[in-house]
Swiss-Prot record:
Catalytic reactions of this protein: octanoyl-[ACP] + L-lysyl-[protein] = N(6)-octanoyl-L-lysyl-[protein] + holo-[ACP] + H(+)
Any single GO BP term: protein modification process
Gene3D superfamilies: Bira Bifunctional Protein, Domain 2
Miscellaneous notes: In the reaction, the free carboxyl group of octanoic acid is attached via an amide linkage to the epsilon-amino group of a specific lysine residue of lipoyl domains of lipoate-dependent enzymes. The reaction proceeds via an octanoyl-thioester enzyme intermediate.
Superkingdom classification of source: Bacteria
Name listed for the protein in its UniProt record: Octanoyltransferase LipM
Complexes and interactors: Monomer.
CDD domains, per the entry: LplA
SUPFAM superfamilies referenced in this protein's UniProt entry, alphabetically: Class II aaRS and biotin synthetases
Function: Catalyzes the transfer of endogenously produced octanoic acid from octanoyl-acyl-carrier-protein onto the lipoyl domain of GcvH, an intermediate carrier during protein lipoylation.
Domain BPL/LPL catalytic: residue ranges: 33-248
Active site: C150 (acyl-thioester intermediate)
Site label Lowers pKa of active site Cys, positions: K165
């Protein structure tokens, strides 16, 4: 028997609303058994701040700066904290909860899916490994984030290199389907990132910023080589095929599917009601 075939979509650069709408549509189509499991890579037309499903914008985000910089802004359907998507490859994995290779628990499914990321980083020549909270205190810290910034600390089974988080991921389960998506940054501009978040005062902001450098890292900070998005795509194609033991088959959306995504993008992900919901 050959390997199981999964769909592979490389969307390229899209608008913030389109990116989130396509992930949701892929989840819906998976639930309706209209598509096999799917791996998707994408980028962003403009630098974009995404916030987690439960995040309170007025508490965490400096929207004046987001608007002043003309950045994109959209709320994800996954949890977690704020992510600035810029100079990165974003990935999503959409697979049924009852897939024979998918564990029932969120953390174990995270581990299985993230094996594709781990093998992708290894294909780039990076010594990546899983972060697993070692103590009860570490586990408690996962429940009580210190700031609204996503890369602030590793969570269960996130990928680290030299002790620093190198990929931020979030997962949701809806309609019997797992959607995991995340950010693989080539570079991180700390000043740009921290300007987008609200802090009690400048001193706290500077302290959080300096702590961040010891906890998170981007690919091009770790190597003398300067990788491109194209090289990342090739490496993570290989990584997901190896890590999940599948064959990726390129897929293009039909006109009907594209229309469905565009409609959802406009009606939901471009709406203030969704993006600024309390």
């Amino acid at each position: 028997m050959g390997k199981e075939k999964w769909c592979y979509i490389n969307s390229g650069q899209c608008s913030p609303a389109f990116n989130m709408a396509l992930d949701e549509c892929l989840l819906n189509w998976q639930s309706e058994k209209k598509m096999p499991p799917t791996i998707r890579f994408y980028e962003w037309e403009v630098p974009t701040l995404t916030v987690g499903y439960f995040q309170r914008v007025e508490k965490d985000i400096n929207m004046d700066v987001v608007n002043e910089k003309k950045y994109g802004f959209v709320r994800r359907q996954t949890g977690g904290r704020g992510v600035l998507h810029d100079k990165e490859l974003t990935y999503s994995v959409i697979v049924s909860e009852d897939h024979p290779n998918m564990p029932k628990t969120v953390t174990e499914a995270y581990r299985v899916i993230s094996q594709g990321l781990l093998d992708g980083f290894k294909a780039l020549g990076l010594e990546a490994y899983y972060a697993v909270p070692k103590t009860e205190a570490d586990r408690e810290n996962l429940k009580n984030p210190r700031s609204g910034v996503c890369f602030d600390a590793p969570s269960w089974y996130e990928i680290v290199v030299e002790g620093r988080k190198i990929a931020g991921s979030a997962q949701t389960r809806q309609k019997g389907v797992i959607l995991q998506h995340g950010s693989i940054p080539l570079e991180i501009d700390l000043d740009e990132l921290y300007d987008l978040f609200l802090f009690p005062n400048e001193r706290v902001k500077e302290r959080m910023k300096s702590m961040f450098s010891s906890k998170a890292v981007a690919i091009n900070e770790l190597t003398d080589r300067t990788f491109t998005i194209e090289q990342l795509i090739k490496a993570f194609e290989v990584g997901f095929e190896k890590g999940l033991d599948v064959e990726l088959v390129p897929y293009e959306l039909t006109e009907e599917q594209l229309h469905e995504v565009q409609t959802l993008a406009k009606e939901k992900y471009e709406s203030n009601e969704w993006n600024y919901k309390k």
